[in-house]
């Protein structure tokens, strides 16, 4: 059923940055509503990588993506922000202090400011150009996202790619998969230096087979059951890797979707913002997280958290133009609704 909601801030996107924006706005007594095209909160963390380990959240040496979302859910619970999930924002009209947002299900949201936390926008995997790929995708022999590590227990796993996802999953599946081979077309990996060092150590121990420099060439099997992955080196020489599952990690193909039609200044499929406030080219509309772009931008979850705080503070005078904002630490004022 379509809903009509009036609030201070409409947050479009319910990934980590969008969820934390609820907290930052709530601490400034700004009402919020969360809108997301997915049917659950968490963005890619929940939909694609719930068991992926994250190592760069301050004070959390390691946490799975799903655990991070659970913690954020607990953190924002006191603010009871309404949610419009499974809704795609199709239209934005009005101006700073008086926006109207429409969704594909007919919802109407009236807000004084907007925070776009749409991540990469609409996303899907970059698929390798291999003959017969669709049959293996349908059977689960080729997977682009790992939602449950236990589903790969005892499997012969071939991972293709040279970035963080390929390296992190190779390390995470050690001791779970019966064998792990990592195929990369270059001798060096583009992952975080510490992760790349751990991968080299695992290879030296014999826990992981580094197949470099090679690239995917063909899949062999029958009726969707994978038997071997054929790889080729730079000279065209091939070898076969025994495999039950292939995990190609070649990044995501992303599309800003409706965001690109909202009249905002864009650059290379990102929304340009002012670094100190995260405000876009349209007054009253802000962008945070992976969708936002400015000089020196780092695509890190923790930077999205910082941007959420900056945007919330910049929004306060829009919602309360006659009220001075006195900065306070959370240790001083506490969190509303908590003991």
Swiss-Prot record:
Q: What SUPFAM superfamilies does the database record attribute to this sequence?
A: FAD/NAD(P)-binding domain
GO molecular-function annotation terms? ferredoxin-NADP+ reductase activity; flavin adenine dinucleotide binding; NADP binding
Against Pfam families, the record matches this protein to:
Pyr_redox_2
Please tell me where FAD binds in this chain.
36, 44, 49, 89, 123, 290, 331
**Per the annotation, how and in what number is the cofactor bound?**
Binds 1 FAD per subunit.
User: Per its UniProt entry, which superkingdom is the organism in?
Assistant: Bacteria
Checking InterPro entries in the record gives: FAD/NAD-bd_sf (IPR036188), FAD/NAD-binding_dom (IPR023753), Fd--NADP_Rdtase_type_2 (IPR022890), Ferredoxin-NADP_redctase_2 (IPR050097)
Q: What is its EC number?
A: 1.18.1.2
Keywords in alphabetical order: FAD, Flavoprotein, NADP, Oxidoreductase
Please give the cofactor(s) recorded in the UniProt entry for this protein.
Answer: FAD
Reaction(s) catalyzed by this protein? 2 reduced [2Fe-2S]-[ferredoxin] + NADP(+) + H(+) = 2 oxidized [2Fe-2S]-[ferredoxin] + NADPH
Q: Broadest EC class? A: oxidoreductase
Per UniProt, subunit arrangement is: Homodimer.
> Family assignment?
Belongs to the ferredoxin--NADP reductase type 2 family.
PANTHER family to which the protein is assigned, alphabetical: THIOREDOXIN REDUCTASE 1-RELATED-RELATED
User: Mind telling me what this protein is named?
Assistant: Ferredoxin--NADP reductase
Species of origin: Acidiphilium cryptum (strain JF-5)
């Amino acid at each position: 059923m379509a809903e009509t909601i009036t609030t201070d801030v409409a947050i479009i996107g319910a990934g980590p940055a969008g969820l934390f924006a609820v907290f930052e706005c709530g601490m400034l007594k700004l009402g919020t509503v969360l809108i997301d095209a997915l049917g659950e909160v968490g963005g890619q963390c929940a939909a694609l990588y719930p068991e992926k380990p994250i190592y760069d959240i301050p004070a959390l040496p390691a946490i799975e993506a799903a655990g991070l979302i659970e913690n954020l859910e607990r953190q924002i619970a006191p603010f009871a922000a309404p949610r419009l999930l499974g809704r795609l924002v199709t239209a934005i009209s009005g101006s700073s202090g008086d926006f109207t947002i429409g969704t594909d299900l007919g919802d109407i949201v009236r807000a004084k400011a907007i925070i776009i936390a749409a991540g990469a926008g609409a996303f899907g995997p970059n698929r390798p150009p291999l003959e017969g790929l669709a049959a293996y995708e349908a059977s689960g022999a080729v997977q682009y996202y790992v939602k449950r590590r236990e589903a790969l227990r005892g499997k012969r796993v071939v991972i293709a790619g040279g970035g963080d996802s390929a390296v992190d999953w190779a390390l995470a599946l050690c001791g779970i998969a019966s064998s792990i081979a990592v195929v990369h077309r270059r001798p060096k990996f583009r992952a975080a230096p510490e992760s790349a060092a751990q991968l080299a150590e695992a290879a030296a121990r014999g826990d992981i087979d580094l197949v470099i420099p090679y690239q995917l060439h063909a899949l062999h099997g029958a009726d969707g059951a994978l038997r071997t992955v054929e790889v080729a080196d730079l000279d065209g020489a091939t070898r076969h890797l025994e495999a039950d599952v292939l995990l190609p990690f070649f990044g995501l193909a992303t599309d800003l979707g409706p965001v690109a039609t909202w009249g905002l200044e864009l650059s290379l499929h990102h929304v340009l913002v002012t670094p100190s406030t995260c405000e876009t080219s349209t007054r009253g509309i802000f962008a945070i997280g992976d969708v936002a772009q400015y000089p020196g931008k780092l695509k890190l979850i923790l930077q999205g958290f910082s941007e959420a705080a900056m945007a919330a503070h910049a929004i306060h005078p829009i919602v309360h133009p006659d009220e001075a904002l006195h900065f306070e630490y959370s240790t001083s004022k506490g969190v509303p609704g908590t003991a």
